[in-house]
Curated annotation (Swiss-Prot):
It comes from the Bacteria. It is found in: Cytoplasm. Transmembrane segments: none annotated. The keyword Hydrolase applies. Homotetramer. It comes from Streptococcus pyogenes serotype M4 (strain MGAS10750). It holds the Pfam family Peptidase_C15. This is Pyrrolidone-carboxylate peptidase. Its EC number is 3.4.19.3. Coiled coil: none annotated. The active site is at E78, C141, H165. One of its GO terms (cellular component) is cytosol. PROSITE patterns: PYRASE_CYS, PYRASE_GLU. It is an enzyme of class 3 (hydrolase).
Amino acid sequence: MKILITGFDPFGGEAINPALEAIKKLPATIHGAEIKCIEVPTVFQKSADVLQQHIESFQPDAVLCIGQAGGRTGLTPERVAINQDDARIPDNEGNQPIDTPIRADGKAAYFSTLPIKAMVAAIHQAGLPASVSNTAGTFVCNHLMYQALYLVDKYCPNAKAGFMHIPFMMEQVVDKPNTAAMNLDDITRGIEAAIFAIVDFKDRSDLKRVGGATH
């Protein structure tokens, strides 16, 4: 099994991005799966262009995109990506699309095809906080998740794809009182646990367990 992992460069005034720092620490093989990690720019469309190049060349069985969600308290596999860019802040090249479809020929939304509930369970078993998230936002994270599912559907129809948000690293919240954070080793360990679940559930349906929210 081949798994493509992506991590964004720093954005929004941050000097580091835990997504990129964590994937740099991943081993080349996890649970028998070949792991390829790539950096993507926090830029609308350009991030998808980089991803497309690697999907076409690597032909992965699964794509897991990782992104920073400052303020979240645990690792959060995303359930759905919507066909809409609505940027609260500019991306790293100054683009700030508002109410703009990501793909004119795409679906209104794509659901993750990764085993998100099994991923949460595996992260819990590793002793770390995790939950299913029902919104990936409307910035570049949602953009890339949507594009990943669109591209996999087009170029690797038998592959699975999805996205997982992770918290700030400890050093990012030194000047952010009462903001949740996690140390880098634990973030990396959580990502590895999620990858274990992706491999384990390659040929079977996701777990049936509560993962919803009331609001």
